[in-house]
Amino acid sequence: MRPTRPVSWLTPARKAFEAFPDGARQTVIDALSVAAEGGMAGIAKPMKGLGSGVFEVALPFRGNAFRVVYAVQLGDELWVVHAFQKKSTQGIKTPKHEIDLI
């Protein structure tokens, strides 16, 4: 069994995450904890087009949609590289301009 990885944050991702509602933040923390222990939460999925080891937590919460992107193949840590509230009300696809930021 592998030891639990520490979770590190890029500063812009942390600031955006801190603006999420409390319940959404706790759900994301739970999903990141699963990832840090080597698993994948049910609300996480691999991000297409960004290589292996990059995952997205997609969270619908009280009529809004929140996303957190993390990478697991950066040394011994799990890195949260991007967090945002999805503004579009149509479709579930992550907007291209958000992917470009990653």
Segments and roles (model prediction):
Residues 1-65, 74-77, 84-101:
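Basic, Lys/Arg-enriched alpha-helical interface segments
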